[in-house]
C-alpha cells in the first residue's frame, strides 16, 4: 500500500514539476516560450493515473467485496438492480470517462477490446483497431498514431488493459456474451484508448 501511495505521489509530483517548469519557462525572458506538453508525455501521464486507479479499485475494492470477500457490497454488471450493488472495474472506468467528458474536451478516453462483451466497446476507427491488434500481439508495448475525425486531427494512444486479478478473468470468461472465454491472469484483455486533439 505504501509503495502504491509512493508511486501515486511520484506521478503527482512529476506532473506538478512539469507544470511548474512550463510556467517558469514562460515567465523567464531568456527562455523560449513553452507552447505545450508533448502529446506522448501527456497521454502516458494520463494513462499512468488511470491504470493506477483501475488496478487499485480492482485489487483493493472489488476483489475484497466479491464472492470470496465481505459480501456487504456486491460488485455486479447489473449493480443498479441489486441491493448493495456497486460497479465492476470496467463500469467504474467508463463512469470516470463520462464524467471527464462533461468537464473538458482536452482529451477523451475509453476502454475497448477486440473481444468486447458489449459491442459498443469494440474498435470504431481504423487506428483503434490497429492499436488494439498491436498491443495484443506485442505485450507490454503501447501504440501511438494520428487520425483525422471530421475536421480535427487527433493524437491517439492505445495502452494495454491487462488482467490484474482473477476477478477480471472470471468475469469475462464466465460471461454469456463474451466472445473469448480463456483469458488468463496477466494477459491483454483490451486497451485504453486516449485521444487528444492536436492544435492546428
List each language-model region with its residue ranges:
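The canonical Cys-X-X-Cys-His
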Residues: 164-176
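Hydrophobic helical h-region of N-terminal Sec-dependent signal peptides
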Residues: 10-11, 15
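Bacterial N-terminal signal peptides that target proteins for export
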Residues: 1-9
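C-terminal motif of bacterial Sec signal peptides marking the signal peptidase cleavage site
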Residues: 18-20
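Extracytoplasmic c-type cytochrome modules immediately beyond a signal peptide or single-pass transmembrane anchor
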Residues: 23-163, 177-200
Amino acid at each position: 500500500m505504501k509503495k502504491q501511495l509512493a508511486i501515486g505521489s511520484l506521478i503527482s509530483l512529476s506532473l506538478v514539476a512539469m507544470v511548474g517548469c512550463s510556467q517558469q519557462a514562460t515567465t523567464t525572458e531568456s527562455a523560449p516560450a513553452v507552447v505545450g506538453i508533448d502529446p506522448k508525455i501527456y497521454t502516458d501521464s494520463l494513462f499512468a493515473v488511470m491504470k493506477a486507479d483501475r488496478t487499485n479499485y480492482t485489487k483493493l475494492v472489488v476483489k475484497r467485496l466479491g464472492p470470496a470477500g465481505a459480501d456487504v457490497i456486491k460488485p455486479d454488471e447489473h449493480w443498479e438492480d441489486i441491493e448493495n450493488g456497486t460497479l465492476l472495474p470496467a463500469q467504474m472506468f467508463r463512469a470516470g470517462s463520462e464524467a471527464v467528458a462533461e468537464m473538458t474536451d482536452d482529451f477523451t478516453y475509453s476502454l475497448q477490446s477486440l473481444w468486447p462483451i458489449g459491442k459498443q466497446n469494440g474498435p470504431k476507427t481504423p487506428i483503434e483497431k490497429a492499436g488494439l491488434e498491436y498491443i495484443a500481439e506485442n505485450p507490454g508495448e503501447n501504440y501511438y498514431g494520428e487520425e483525422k475525425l471530421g475536421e480535427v486531427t487527433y493524437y491517439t494512444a492505445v495502452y494495454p488493459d491487462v488482467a490484474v486479478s482473477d476477478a477480471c478473468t472470471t468475469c469475462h470468461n464466465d460471461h454469456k456474451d463474451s466472445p473469448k472465454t480463456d483469458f488468463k491472469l496477466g494477459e491483454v484483455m483490451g486497451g485504453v484508448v486516449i485521444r487528444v486533439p492536436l492544435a492546428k
